[in-house]
Structure formats: C-alpha cells, structure tokens
C-alpha cells in the first residue's frame, strides 16, 4: 500500500500487507511514521537509531512508513541483520488517515511512534480516537522556543506519551499539557563513528586538501535555509577577515551545504559579490556518509551554528563528539550542548533580539537573533585562543556528549520507554488507561 501524490490509497502490485510472520511472532510490533529512516536527515537518522535499538533488544518488530521525500521506487524494503523484523514502506508526505488505518487494521501493531514537526501531523491527531481506541500513540517531539505554545495543547493531549528531544521542549510539554506522560529523551550520536581521529589520519586528509592546510578552519554544517542565517554568516565572516590581528591567509570558512537550496540564499553569488579570495571560503555540496562527516569535524578547529531557531542541532553535537568545540546561538537545544550549567564546551552567544513571529499554524514563537558584534567577538576569541585551551574545550565537550547524549543510553531509554508503554497502555484487548471522552465543568 502506498499513498500517491494525490493522497489516494493504492494497492501496490496487489500485495497483501497482512504479514503472517508478524501475526505468529510474539514480539511487540511498532508502527513508525517519520522521514524515511534510511535517509540522512536528522529525523530519519534519529528514527533509525530508535528502531535499531528496539530491534537489537530482541523484544520488538518494526513497520516503518518512510516519508518526507518524493520516492522514485515505492517497493517495500525488508531490512535484514537484526533479531527483529523490519519492513519499510515508502510513502509520500507522511502518509494519510486511510493509509495509517489500513496498516493498523491489517498489521495489528501494538504502538504507533511518529516524529517530525507537529504541523505535518494535524491530520493524524484528527483521527486519534480511531487509533488510540486500539493502540497508544508515542510522539517524539521538539519545539524550538518559548512562549509556551498553548495552541499545541490539543495536539499534545492527543498522545499517550510524548518524548521530548530538548530540555526546552520538556519544560514546554509539561507546562502546556501536564496530564500527558512526558519523558526527556535527547538526541544521541554514535561515538563509534563520530569520534576523535588520530593525528596521522587528520594529517593524511589535510595533505590532499590544500585549502585547509595551515589554516584555522571554522566549519558550518547546516541546511541553507532562512533560519540558519546563511547570509549573516557569510557577510560577518567577511568582516572578521578584516579585523586587526586576523591573518586572512590562515583562516577558512568551510561550508557543508546546498548553495542553491530554494529555501535559502544563493551562496556562490554572495561569495562572488563580496569578493572572497581563493581558500577563504570552501564549499562542500555533496551528501556524505557519516564516517566522512566525522573526518570533516576533525579537520575543523571549531563548528558554528547561529540559527535563530534550532530545536536541537545535531551538527554541533556530532562536532563535540569528535572533540571539536562549538560556537552557537544560545537558543533551543543548542544551549544544553555548549554548557552543562557549570562548564563550557565552546562559546555561547546570547541573542541580541527576541522577535515574536508566527504563521497561520504557529501563531507565536520567539525568533532569537544574535548581533554582528557578538559574533565577531566570538570568532576572534576562538581564533586567538591558546590551542591547548581550545583542545581542552573540545575534550570537555566530548566527555559531555559521552555522559549525557551517549548512544548506549539513548537506546536503553527507548527500549525501556516503549516496553513501559506496552505494559502500561496495552493494545487491542489489553488496551487501558485511555478514555475517548472528557468531562469538563462549564
């Protein structure tokens, strides 16, 4: 079954989605909805990590509806190599009501897990009564900023359990919908991949990449989108090169992004317009596997994220895991990465302005902007910092990630959480702790 571009339910080559293997299996079956879990997006990657942890526990099977992109091939994929059963069904968008109900009726999953921005799931929450009468709904959620989004209250209350990605999100959910079970489950990085490389490995890479040789490298790994502040980054970096004490022949801004993203600015035009010299800015435009991304963090001296809104920010967490310090805007989930409240693992820049913006779906939310002056000061401080101190910042950040965002703890949290959801809420004949009516005093 797939949902085509017109969101019409279609039989895929006459295939019956009922799977006898799952019916006979006594494992807990989870239906997931998210970005395709084999895509390199943040949502896709984290969902893959969740799924892998569940499967490796030996207690779960997983059926995934993989969306977010226009697929060239809608053939279901059975993923081998795990103790449990895992099958992925490509869908347009994130599916639709008819599709989800069909999977629930035919595959009989015990839990529905879903993840991404809430604006993509209004259709799902509109049918929560038909879903939750049979199985619990678990939402993996992040919200960028305050004020408390009271307009999300009805969505939060349409879930049995919410897992919050950041401390900001955890506080928001507990305040807006205190009766909903909530757990703080932050993102994680795989330290087997994102780790500190040896000097020999780094030297080998640098020897074949001339632009980075004998230069201080600022790394920016972000989507080229408005909230990421691409234009401000480039213009202000140009100003940084002209500061007294900066040797522009010994500094490089390394940008891993799509310079032609329709949601962003024309990066190459900006670079040409501002007259950057060769080697001052280097672009990396190809999608790279995780092990190669890990090496990029290692050849960098510092990683930057100055987004005006950032629910979490995986790139800076990956950077810290590799031992590379960060410069970030003190907003959203970036705040808990750069400091634990006592020690710092880079430089945090306090927003200079907090505008309340919004849209028809999101009536209000803070947009945190840093100032040019504060950004230049942060770049200069990192650039002029004693190398041993900068290395120590990175090592402290690495320890921070290992203690608070470890891959092992992330997996255990999800196995324990989904096991407790199954025990406490049940499914079908054992469904409990759910009422589809609410009585309020007028």
Roles of regions detected by a PLM:
Residues 2-22, 358, 362-368, 372-442:
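C-terminal amphipathic helix plus adjacent low-complexity
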Residues 264-287, 291:
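Nucleotide-activated donor-binding/catalytic signature segment of Leloir-type glycosyltransferases, i.e.
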Residues 195-211:
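A short helix/loop element that forms part of the nucleotide-sugar donor recognition site in Leloir-type
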Residues 1-78, 107, 440-442:
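N-terminal subdomain of nucleotide-sugar transferases
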Residues 168, 188:
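Carbohydrate-associated surface elements
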Residues 308:
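Aromatic "clamp/platform" in nucleotide-sugar-dependent glycosyltransferases that forms part
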Residues 325-328, 338-339, 345-348:
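Short hydrophobic beta-strand element within catalytic cores of glycosyltransferases
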Residues 31-32, 211-228, 234-237, 253:
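Conserved donor-binding/catalytic core segment of Leloir-type glycosyltransferases
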